[in-house]
């Protein structure tokens, strides 16, 4: 159980059987009555935002969340297949729950999977990753100053915009949150 005094950004709580992550919170005292805590919460299951106000000192439950080290095996239609690194148990996760992160998964890659009551919810990947360019238009020699970009297909199938001087076979660093080119490796 958490008290409202334990609230901080990123804390995961359960309200009325639904897991939430605290995005923002503010303690305030109205002119009359006890102190309150106004929170902005993200529903972990749906991603929707919700504002909930708690009385100061009110208790909320900890959600049944668990993080496990897993290995990404392969993609099967609209599902991602992971293997637990300790039990070797395989888990299916719908692509729709990954929020675009599936474009950064390579076969055999290790990552952390967030589970709620045993069901996979989200994957935790690094903020930036180095991936190989497998398909792009040839670049013009010496054109390194202009701000022109072109699409490049990466080894995972993800397509990102890269500067014109990037060629097939180059290894590039990509921001996993914005899917932007960060530099060559």
From Swiss-Prot:
GO terms for biological process: peptide biosynthetic process. One of its GO terms (cellular component) is cytoplasm. Disulfide bonds: none annotated. The keyword Secreted does not apply. The keyword Lyase does not apply. Pathway: Protein biosynthesis; polypeptide chain elongation. SUPFAM superfamilies: Nucleic acid-binding proteins, Translation proteins SH3-like domain. One of its GO terms (molecular function) is translation elongation factor activity. It is found in: Cytoplasm. Keywords: Cytoplasm, Elongation factor, Protein biosynthesis. Pfam families: EFP, EFP_N, Elong-fact-P_C. PANTHER family: ELONGATION FACTOR P, ELONGATION FACTOR P (EF-P) FAMILY PROTEIN. Involved in peptide bond synthesis. Stimulates efficient translation and peptide-bond synthesis on native or reconstituted 70S ribosomes in vitro. Probably functions indirectly by altering the affinity of the ribosome for aminoacyl-tRNA, thus increasing their reactivity as acceptors for peptidyl transferase. Belongs to the elongation factor P family. This is Elongation factor P. It comes from Desulfovibrio desulfuricans (strain ATCC 27774 / DSM 6949 / MB).
